[in-house]
From Swiss-Prot:
Subunit structure, interactors included: Homotetramer or heterotetramer with KCND3 or KCND1. Associates with the regulatory subunits KCNIP2, KCNIP3 and KCNIP4. Interacts with the regulatory subunit KCNIP1; this interaction mediates the capture of both the N- and C-terminus of KCND2, preventing N-type inactivation and stabilizing the S6 conformation, thereby accelerating closed state inactivation and recovery. In vivo, probably exists as heteromeric complex containing variable proportions of KCND1, KCND2, KCND3, KCNIP1, KCNIP2, KCNIP3, KCNIP4, DPP6 and DPP10.
Species this chain originates from: Mus musculus
Gene that this sequence comes from: Kcnd2
GO terms of molecular function: A-type (transient outward) potassium channel activity; metal ion binding; voltage-gated monoatomic ion channel activity involved in regulation of postsynaptic membrane potential; voltage-gated potassium channel activity
Location of the region described as Required for dendritic targeting in the Swiss-Prot/TrEMBL record: 474-489
Protein name: A-type voltage-gated potassium channel KCND2
Regions of this protein lying in the Cytoplasmic compartment: 1-184, 250-256, 308-321, 404-630
UniProt KW keywords: Cell junction, Cell membrane, Cell projection, Ion channel, Ion transport, Membrane, Metal-binding, Phosphoprotein, Postsynaptic cell membrane, Potassium, Potassium channel, Potassium transport, Synapse, Transmembrane, Transmembrane helix, Transport, Voltage-gated channel, Zinc
Region entry Interaction with KCNIP1, spans: 71-90
Length: 630
């Protein structure tokens, strides 16, 4: 027997650790051909230079996606025998892991927009994200959607009015963003002042102000000084009425505006006044009017337009509507249950105030909210026990949705703070750019007007002085860019003030060729980097600009372009500021307006140029194209 055990024991041990099966048959041959076939199915995915290797069968598990279908062959490169994708390799790691494990995860450190773009490119839907990451993904996506909506609203109610905006759109923009104009800001503060005055008057008119002659009882201030309070209320209601009518007239959608909460508050705030004007002196009718006057207190909600904190609180309550609904439903159930229990528990007591189940509602509400007024208390032992349970259950029911509400309030508050910070940074950045460009353009136009550029071009010894006067590197490059635009195009830069004062006149003159130093042949910092084109020698007649106009240089914002028949003209730019001999009136009733923005100046490059230049065209007239915002 021992010999038999010794014969099969090694096989049992080998089978236990997975070396060989228990069967006594011969071991099968290794799958050499299958392994070779599997190695041939190993594919390489090159994602922006990062190589990933996986099996073809792994990708073909999901044939409805890009990598699992034959569409990936469009990205195959036979030279490298790789599939190349110009995408984000960091996010692609998580996408490839989905093919390997069948679970898609969301990397919390990645941008939600970039992640959605990668999923859409590879044909994956966000709904397959694992449960461990799906809630985080939904929260980040909701925050991003709210941020984009906030940015869109900011762009729509931006500080700069678009030229295509109608008067109605401008009025609505002024109401929604009062800081766009001075008048809108003044009206904003005036309405806020009258809201405060109306609320204070509504409170003060109930304060006793002493007894009047013939009355023993003290009269409230609203009755003793009825005329003064009526005039004050009339002034407030007139302001509120004008504001409501203007908002209604300027609203993009009047139907949506009328149905909005703030519109209903505005109507409720002013409606009691107009009802009181048409009321009779009948005491029964006036009693109903006194009841309506309580709605004047709703004017305090008009402060929500002037308070960011109130708006955030409103957004929080709106976003927590489901949690608040759950809280109300839970409290209602608990109130009904405990009121019924307390009624039957106290039914046997003669001194009990629990006369009915509706009467017990007051006790359960006060107890569950942990107020405890003490006007109704249980007398029996059973009533005290159930009252204690009611108090503890109220604490639990109310405390459950509170963290959710606080979390939503904190999220909305910080999101609003970030949006304000982004708007402030954007405003400061645009202000710095405008200041830099305006200063550079003003310096350029002033130097042209004073003839400094042409004086500097007369001798090469003065170039260091010109460089020292040019200011910062940004200003130097901006001057160089303006000079290149004047050289390569038939444009001349003039300021807005001179353009308006010139009465839209342009002069043409034929002069012989001159070899005098010109603006186009400047070397050094302002030397050209652009090929020479046919040039014009006309100008807006700004040589006669008075000293006062010279001192107040406007922002460079006008380019005059004349596209007419060409005739030989002098190729010299030395007479840039010379007076014209002939003036031609232009038909400017229908000017063409185009917008252009120059943001990247061209670096200076020194290019030697000779005196042999092609002749420049002569311009006898044509339409003027004003290119603004340069």
């Amino acid at each position: 027997m021992a010999a038999g055990v010794a014969a099969w024991l090694p096989f049992a041990r080998a089978a236990a650790i997975g070396w060989m099966p228990v069967a006594s048959g011969p071991m099968p041959a290794p799958p050499r051909q299958e392994r070779k076939r599997t190695q041939d199915a190993l594919i390489v995915l090159n994602v922006s230079g990062t190589r990933f290797q996986t099996w073809q069968d792994t990708l073909e598990r999901y044939p409805d996606t890009l990598l699992g279908s034959s569409e990936r062959d469009f990205f195959y490169h036979p030279e490298t025998q790789q599939y190349f994708f110009d995408r984000d390799p960091d996010i692609f790691r998580h996408i490839l892991n989905f093919y390997r494990t069948g679970k898609l995860h969301y990397p919390r450190h990645e941008c939600i927009s970039a992640y959605d773009e990668e999923l859409a490119f590879f044909g994956l839907i966000p709904e397959i994200i694992g449960d461990c990451c799906y809630e985080e993904y939904k929260d980040r996506r909701r925050e991003n959607a709210e941020r984009l909506q906030d940015d869109a609203d900011t762009d729509n109610t931006g500080e700069s009015a678009l030229p295509t905006m109608t008067a109605r759109q401008r009025v609505w923009r002024a109401f929604e963003n009062p800081h766009t104009s001075t008048m809108a800001l003044v009206f904003y503060y005036v309405t806020g002042f009258f809201i405060a005055v109306s609320v204070i008057a509504n409170v003060v008119e109930t304060v006793p102000c002493g007894s009047s002659p013939g009355h023993i009882k003290e009269l409230p201030c609203g009755e003793r000084y009825a005329v003064a309070f009526f005039c004050l209320d009339t002034a407030c209601v007139m302001i509120f009425t004008v504001e409501y009518l203007l908002r209604l007239a300027a609203a993009p959608s009047r139907y949506r505006f009328v149905r909005s909460v703030m519109s209903i508050i505005d109507v409720v705030a002013i409606l009691p006044y107009y009802i009181g004007l048409v009321m009779t002196d009948n005491e029964d009718v006036s009693g109903a009017f006194v009841t309506l006057r309580v709605f004047r207190v709703f004017r305090i909600f008009k402060f929500s337009r002037h308070s960011q904190g109130l708006r955030i609180l409103g957004y929080t309550l709106k976003s927590c509507a489901s949690e608040l609904g759950f809280l109300l439903f839970s409290l209602t159930m608990a109130i009904i249950i405990f009121a019924t229990v307390m009624f039957y528990a106290e039914k046997g007591s003669s001194a009990s105030k629990f006369t009915s189940i509706p009467a017990a509602f007051w006790y359960t509400i006060v107890t569950m909210t942990t107020l405890g007024y003490g006007d109704m208390v249980p007398k029996t032992i059973a009533g005290k026990i159930f009252g204690s349970i009611c108090s503890l259950s109220g604490v639990l029911v109310i405390a459950l949705p509170v963290p959710v509400i606080v979390s939503n309030f904190s999220r909305i508050y910080h999101q609003n703070q970030r949006a304000d910070k982004r708007r402030a940074q954007k405003k400061a950045r645009l202000a710095r750019i405008r200041a830099a460009k305006s200063g550079s353009a003003n310096a350029y136009m002033q130097s042209k007007r004073n003839g400094l550029l042409s004086n500097q071009l007369q001798s090469s010894e003065d170039e260091p002085a010109f460089i020292s006067k040019s200011g910062s590197s940004f200003e130097t490059q901006h001057h160089h860019l303006l000079h290149c635009l004047e050289k390569t195009t038939n444009h001349e830069f003039v300021d807005e003030q001179v353009f308006e004062e010139s009465c839209m006149e342009v002069a043409t003159v034929n002069r012989p060729s001159s070899h005098s130093p010109s603006l186009s042949s400047q070397q050094g910092v302002t030397s050209t980097c652009c090929s020479r084109r046919h040039k014009k020698t006309f100008r807006i007649p700004n040589a006669n600009v008075s000293g006062s106009h010279r001192g107040s240089v406007q922002e460079l914002s006008t380019i005059q372009i004349r596209c007419v028949e060409r005739t030989p003209l002098s190729n010299s730019r030395s007479s840039l500021n010379a007076k014209m001999e002939e003036c031609v009136k232009l038909n400017c009733e229908q000017p063409y307006v185009t917008t252009a923005i120059i943001s990247i100046p061209t670096p200076p490059v020194t290019t030697p140029e000779g005196d042999d230049r092609p002749e420049s065209p002569e311009y006898s007239g044509g339409n003027i194209v004003r290119v603004s915002a340069l």
